[in-house]
Amino acid sequence: MRPSQRQANELRPVRLTRRYTRHAEGSVLVEFGDTRVLCTASVEEAVPPFLKGKGRGWVTAEYGMLPRATHTRSAREAAKGKQTGRTQEIQRLIGRSLRAVVDLAALGERQVVIDCDVLQADGGTRTASITGAYVALHDALEGLVAAGKLAANPMTDFVAAISVGIVDGVPVLDLDYTEDSGCDTDMNVVMTGSGGIIEVQGTAEGTPFSRTELNALIDLAEAGIGRLVELQKAALAGA
């Protein structure tokens, strides 16, 4: 049995709370167990310079952690004057994942900026960010449809992400911090609602993993992401 008393293929309790803030066009508080991330989507009626005049839009993301999101306080990156490599990697991953399910030509010459701010971290912050950011982006784009600025929502599919890993020789789903810090293999998987793979990030922390174990982890992630997509659909079906 895992430290959280979950089965190997069991997600932590997941909650998606829409319209969590007042000002952003889309906002979601996403909770994966004790990991909590505030995701907002802000619409800008302009595009980056490299897209000007090309008739296409853009979706980008920024990611950060509150100083006391972790067990001990971390200095704000703004105070240090630069972002860490980890932060840059995660925000690029979030942006890539969302752009994979948006028809950027249909979006028109506008940009949506996703902000993912980790309020409390207990493992899986990047996967929670992607899963919550999808819902925030969906709401922001629906707002453009309601305002008559878009004929239809340009999102082409759902997208969600989950962590998997090998802990004490057993493939497990949705690692918390305790498992993540002591696992043999750590992997993050991003997939669409229709089963397309967007990204797989996998590392052997100690003993190399086999192709059979890799396949088992992907299968575990695919099933978990399927459940997350159902939760996204349920959240979006709410008033």
Curated annotation (Swiss-Prot):
GO terms for biological process: rRNA catabolic process; rRNA processing; tRNA processing. Homohexameric ring arranged as a trimer of dimers. Phosphorolytic 3'-5' exoribonuclease that plays an important role in tRNA 3'-end maturation. Removes nucleotide residues following the 3'-CCA terminus of tRNAs; can also add nucleotides to the ends of RNA molecules by using nucleoside diphosphates as substrates, but this may not be physiologically important. Probably plays a role in initiation of 16S rRNA degradation (leading to ribosome degradation) during starvation. InterPro entries: ExoRNase_PH_dom1, ExoRNase_PH_dom2, ExoRNase_PH_dom2_sf, PNPase/RNase_PH_dom_sf, Ribosomal_Su5_D2-typ_SF, RNase_PH, RNase_PH_bac-type, RNase_PH_CS. Belongs to the RNase PH family. Transmembrane segments: none annotated. Phosphate binds at residues 86, 124-126. This is Ribonuclease PH. It is an enzyme of class 2 (transferase). It comes from Azoarcus sp. (strain BH72). It catalyses: tRNA(n+1) + phosphate = tRNA(n) + a ribonucleoside 5'-diphosphate. Keywords: Nucleotidyltransferase, RNA-binding, rRNA processing, Transferase, tRNA processing, tRNA-binding. It comes from the Bacteria. GO terms for molecular function: 3'-5'-RNA exonuclease activity; tRNA binding; tRNA nucleotidyltransferase activity. Its EC number is 2.7.7.56. PANTHER family: EXOSOME COMPLEX COMPONENT, EXOSOME COMPLEX COMPONENT RRP41. Pfam families: RNase_PH, RNase_PH_C.
